[in-house]
């Protein structure tokens, strides 16, 4: 894969992931405001964004077998707890 393609897919994955969570947050607000149809619409859009993001992630070759996926999850969560958030706290 060309470097520019990889960078574009990575940026698209980040954008789709953020949109997915943003629309779920919007759905939560719509539920709190008793607008179930609007909430349903936001959840449908969130699902579409999730599908887009997963497709980008697959194209990047970042979805592996179960053992590798579990290790990636452990590594990511460990990094957040041991390094990322402590660094944020020290700023």
Mark where each language-model region is.
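Non-heme di-metal
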Residues: 1-91
